[in-house]
Amino acid sequence: MHTINDLPIASMQKRVSSFVLDDIIVAVLLFIIFYDQIIALVAAVPTVLTPEAIETFQYQMKVFNSENLLLILSFKVIYHTFLIWQNNGMTLGKYMMKIKTVDVDNAQNLSFVKALLRAVLRIVSELVLYVGFLVAFFLPLRQTFHDKLARSVVVDV
């Protein structure tokens, strides 16, 4: 059985790349889910920028956000939780970068609870100006805020 000391910690370059890839994948999936609403919003973009037209468009954007924000955040949490938990610690972005998330205590796959906690805290890190991600640059195991609290670490495969 491996310990964390036996495994190579993933580089920040690989982690950032997997983050970007995952966000692109999630954005494409969300675009497909919300296609009709997005097309309606694009069609509502004013061609003449009058104050009234801009105000109407801003209102439509607020409605879209208020109706769908919880669904969007839930989708991101489900994507990260399920793949980290059931796909050998790898989201699609991590798979492409050949890295995975493991439990810091035993170097095994994360439990459902730890994967869920990590996914929720990842959203918190994003909402707080990505500060939770920056801490990885200063910690020996390159753990982010969500890694530290979920007791996980990202390693090379």
Question: Which role fits each region the language model picked out?
Answer:
Residues 1-130, 156-157:
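Short, small/hydrophobic-residue-rich motifs at membrane-helix boundaries and re-entrant hairpins
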Residues 133-157:
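Hydrophobic alpha-helical transmembrane segments and immediately flanking/interface helices
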